[in-house]
């Protein structure tokens, strides 16, 4: 094949390249066989190069170029070797550039997807950080509120401590004043104690002198020492007369002093010396002041003695006790005399009847001692006044001689009264039990022990508990009047649009159920949002609003990722195009799936490529 027979079919080309003519000298000089071989080799190389170019074109989806052999040259354009080589180089560079651009586009797509994934991660991280920032903001708000509460509490504590310090300072001042007052009182009491000790010492001396004078007078009169009751009575008489003599002596001294003062006054009136009169008046004033001080001291001591002395009621009781004791002493003396007489008379006759009488006397003595102790309890100053009235008012109906010997008949009505009071304690216990069941039914009372009986302490305890409960109820519960109750009902009707009173209770039940539903919903929201149970409704509403904002932002971002950064009109246009072309594309895709006998859209392109390869 000659150089002129190498024809290439190329798409529309307007090349003006000229053919290189072969010199006749060279063609003649070359050997025809060598020339033909060289041409064949060049032709094969060129065909191989074009085959490689066709392979590149086919890989990029273009139709291959065909080499034409021996045909009419009118429908073809012929290139020389250089232009064909340039064409091959141009096509090769174009294919390489397209592959490079495709790889670059692929890399750009991969980097775009990677950037999208990173952007999604960053957005998720930003949302997480925003949520965390919101949580931290809530924590900071709660901490600020707690800090404010703690500051308020600390301020309140400081104010309370300052007030307490002021109160303590006032109490300290009051205590100091009281301490000073107590010190003054103690000094006064020490002075009074010293004066009283002096007075006691003086009275003790006077008592000793009185006893000595009594004994001396008694020894002078009777020539013996006092040892019996009559001797004591005689000593009392001696003391009585001695006191009268002492009073007369004091009165006589007072009269003598008054007479001497009158004489001084008369002497002063008679003397013409004025200075002497003034001096005597000054002396009299000093003496009168000293006497007034002495009299004031005596008055105070007498007042204290009067305060320390017993009352009239106590004196009566003491006198009665003295009389009873005198009677008991007389009885004891009589019993001792009888026992002594029996011992002296019947020393030889010690038989059983004497022993029985002796035992009976001892038993009577023990009974008498028991009655004396009961009588002392009855006439004790600590005993109630009603017992004294009972013992005084109810006179015995028996013989007067027996009453004078015994003197315990008044104890019988008192003991009867005691028995009646003790039996009435059971009735009082029952009535208090009924009253306690009415007032304080939640208190359980202990059962009454029949062996021990009813005690006054138990009754007092029951009354105290009832009083405490009644006072607590008065303090805690204040019963409203009818006007306030009517105002409450009318206010409820206005709030909840209730026309009649019959509809109040159904509306209250409805409000209660709605309130319960709302509380349950709020509690569920708190659990879902992981909030504290003590958080308010404002916090719940704010957290729900923040969640809605986050969800709306995520939805808008997802729409932007799907549709791209375009405006609303372009999105509407794309949606209209989708509605217009998607049915035809769906029908075409379904037909392809049926023809190719496949189930997935992603498998269409590989199946078509296989068919294309098989067609070649």
Curated annotation (Swiss-Prot):
The keyword DNA-binding does not apply. TPR repeats lie at residues 502-535. Its main location: cytoplasm. Residues 96-210, 273-335 form a coiled coil. GO terms for biological process: cilium assembly; regulation of microtubule cytoskeleton organization. GO terms for cellular component: centrosome; cytoplasm. The keyword Cytoplasm applies. Keywords: Coiled coil, Cytoplasm, Cytoskeleton, TPR repeat. One of its GO terms (molecular function) is identical protein binding. It is found in: Cytoplasm, Cytoskeleton, Microtubule organizing center, Centrosome. Plays a role in the organization of both preexisting and nascent microtubules in interphase cells. During mitosis, required for the organization and orientation of the mitotic spindle. Directly interacts with tubulin-gamma; this interaction determines centrosomal localization. The coiled-coil domains may be important for tubulin-gamma-binding and hence for centrosomal localization. This is Centrosomal protein of 70 kDa. The lineage of its organism: Eukaryota, Metazoa, Chordata, Craniata, Vertebrata.
